[in-house]
Amino acid sequence: MAILIKNKVPTTLYQVYDNEGKLMDPNHKITLSNEQLKHAFYLMNLSRIMDKKMLVWQRAGKMLNFAPNLGEEALQVGMGMGLNENDWFCPTFRSGALMLYRGVKPEQLLLYWNGNENGSKIEAKYKTLPINITIGAQYSHAAGLGYMLHYKKLPNVAVTMIGDGGTAEGEFYEAMNIASIHKWNSVFCINNNQFAISTRTKLESAVSDLSTKAIAVNIPRIRVDGNDLIASYEAMHEAANYARSGNGPVLIEFFSWRQGPHTTSDDPSIYRTKEEEAEAMKSDPVKRLRNFLFDRGILTPQQEEEMVAKIEQEVQAAYEVMVSKTPVTLDEVFDYNYEKLTPDLARQKAEAKKYFKD
């Protein structure tokens, strides 16, 4: 398989199966096992059911504002499947499905989005940084970790993603440029869900093919159907192997559709039509993978029903953990990262204690 593009020819959108779950090329060799595919389907459903329940809880005042992953489950789980356990992931705020794949527990994501810093205490073995809200900063994190891996001659990569709107940020270019110059072990990804909050791609970028932004920094690129789990896996697998082999970074654009709001404070009905949404849902990633699994006899409707019931219980249990956790103390907010506070942080801590006491 060779899907990396290294020159200025038009980028083709890489796909493995269509909306009905049929292979685009009947001779295409699937390298994932049936168990891996079923596990991927489980995680995609876990992410989706969590998001739907979180939306209900948030509307009922039982959770704070959050960014749903609806419609982007396949690209995130596919990314995770293409990585090794010792590869690093630098999340953005819409990375829930991939974080679940990496081993982060559902209750940690719920805690994070409910304002409890315990949600950011991710075990070191998962090689996953805390969620990053500042758009673009995660690209610098992935470049820096890629530098570390390159410097130590480790056969691993650092991976991150950004939304289509985030490609207008300076750090998007700066991180790729320095990683390209020094051939660091980084894989940069774009989750092109076609909306930067309410702004369409054509109003935020002069090119509709965002993967071509790789040309300016002289790195190879892949443009992949982000609603196709297997295509997303194969794209990440190839890009990661390229970067871990000392060839330098790769840029992957996952073309998708954001089904839900940007965050729960957003109303998509203001800037897109029901007809657009209905058309986009024909390529729903969960439905497409279900069709693929059913068509090949890997999963049955009864097995799916049992899976969903199990997930419903798992998510409810995670919610119960979330509500049982008390918020962290002010001391812990400041003391968690440092053995000894810097003078600036010590001053800020004293100011915070006075403020909250008053």
Swiss-Prot record:
SUPFAM superfamilies: Thiamin diphosphate-binding fold (THDP-binding). One of its GO terms (cellular component) is cell surface. InterPro entries: Alpha-ketoacid_DH_E1_comp, DH_E1, PdhA/BkdA, THDP-binding. GO terms for biological process: branched-chain amino acid catabolic process. Keywords: Oxidoreductase, Pyruvate, Thiamine pyrophosphate. Its cofactor is thiamine diphosphate. It holds the Pfam family E1_dh. It catalyses: N(6)-[(R)-lipoyl]-L-lysyl-[protein] + pyruvate + H(+) = N(6)-[(R)-S(8)-acetyldihydrolipoyl]-L-lysyl-[protein] + CO2. Signal peptide: none annotated. GO terms for molecular function: pyruvate dehydrogenase (acetyl-transferring) activity. It comes from the Bacteria. Coiled coil: none annotated. Its EC number is 1.2.4.1. PANTHER family: 2-OXOISOVALERATE DEHYDROGENASE SUBUNIT ALPHA, MITOCHONDRIAL (PTHR43380:SF1). The pyruvate dehydrogenase complex catalyzes the overall conversion of pyruvate to acetyl-CoA and CO(2). It contains multiple copies of three enzymatic components: pyruvate dehydrogenase (E1), dihydrolipoamide acetyltransferase (E2) and lipoamide dehydrogenase (E3). NCBIfam families: PDH_E1_alph_x (TIGR03181). Heterodimer of an alpha and a beta chain. This is Pyruvate dehydrogenase E1 component subunit alpha. The gene is pdhA.
